[in-house]
Amino acid sequence: MKIVLASNNPGKLAELVPLFAPLGVELIAQSDLGVPESPEPHRTFVENALIKARNAAQHTGLAAIADDAGLCVDAMGGLPGVDTAYYCTQFGYDKTDYNNRRAVLEQMQGQTNRRAALVSTIVAVRSVQDPEPLIASGRVVAELTREPVGEHGFGFDPVMFIPSLG
């Protein structure tokens, strides 16, 4: 069985291919099939993931999997949320993980409530018209550190501390 991954992120493909292979599923990047990147016009993770999955299914005729994820900071009213990937650009920074972390930490200066959640929503559709998309959401709640810690991880990993894990 072939499923298209509605993402142009090579890191996501590298993580997911080994998970699907034992199931006899060949996961193919949408870019390998000429699928244009989908817009993400919605204000929720689930709506954006669904539109991306349907876009990939429409262009390929294959089942599709998509995700949308971001950082939701309590003291910032849930922001940056669905705008996480581009959050730093509103402050004049280039779009990079480093600059996104920098922008969030700058906005959090002086805040005592540092609770935040990394949220990820994954949607799978069997076809573009699938009336029952499979939707899964997860969240990891942590405290934002005041500066990056450690040498591993990507995205917001270096500024997230989970007290129960030390």
Regions found by a protein language model. Give the residues of each.
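Anionic-ligand binding patches
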Residues: 1-4, 10-166
